[in-house]
Amino acid sequence: MSNKDNDLDDDFSLFREAVQGIKKLPQDTIVQQPNRNTKQKEIKRISREASDSEFYFSDEFVPLLSEEGPTRYARDDVSTYEVKRLRRGVYVPDVFLDMHGMTQQEAKRELGAMIAYCVKNEVHCACVQHGIGKHILKQKTPLWLAQHPDVLAFHQAPLEFGGDGALLVLLSIPEK
């Protein structure tokens, strides 16, 4: 036998002698119960997301939007300077929503979910790409955005963010 094998045997025998007579502690046999609140939290989260995505955008309400020039809107309490900054691309969107190929109902649901996501994650600027196509979403999207209480302003996006087929949206983030 080599010297290494003798050292290993000595180590094992020393360990056995050191732990001889030790009993398992009673608390080691207690199984941790799973946190039951996770199911309740999951249910609340799902219902909250469903209500966020079901934010009602009326097709009958038509806000007063400028018909001249590019599509733009600003609430009364928002400076026109902010709209100019949107137009120039000073605000860089952190979130992009591509609505190409969506129905109006899908687009409403996704738009509501995107706005809820932006408010939750404190995203101030988002880009909504509605496309041009048959002009259905291009006409409806500004009307829906103008109805949402968290939308401060929007403007037709600069070319690098989609041009005629997209809107840059400025959102109000409530202070915590």
Curated annotation (Swiss-Prot):
EC number from the UniProt entry: 3.1.-.-
Pfam family, one: Smr
Smr domain residues: 97-172
PROSITE patterns according to UniProt: SMR
Keywords per UniProt: Endonuclease, Hydrolase, Nuclease, RNA-binding, rRNA-binding
GO molecular function terms listed in the Swiss-Prot or TrEMBL record: RNA endonuclease activity; rRNA binding
GO BP: any one term: rescue of stalled ribosome
Subunit structure: Associates with collided ribosomes, but not with correctly translating polysomes.
Family label: Belongs to the SmrB family.
Function in brief: Acts as a ribosome collision sensor. Detects stalled/collided disomes (pairs of ribosomes where the leading ribosome is stalled and a second ribosome has collided with it) and endonucleolytically cleaves mRNA at the 5' boundary of the stalled ribosome. Stalled/collided disomes form a new interface (primarily via the 30S subunits) that binds SmrB. Cleaved mRNA becomes available for tmRNA ligation, leading to ribosomal subunit dissociation and rescue of stalled ribosomes.
Protein's UniProt name: Ribosome rescue factor SmrB
Organism: Vibrio vulnificus (strain YJ016)
Gene name of this polypeptide: smrB
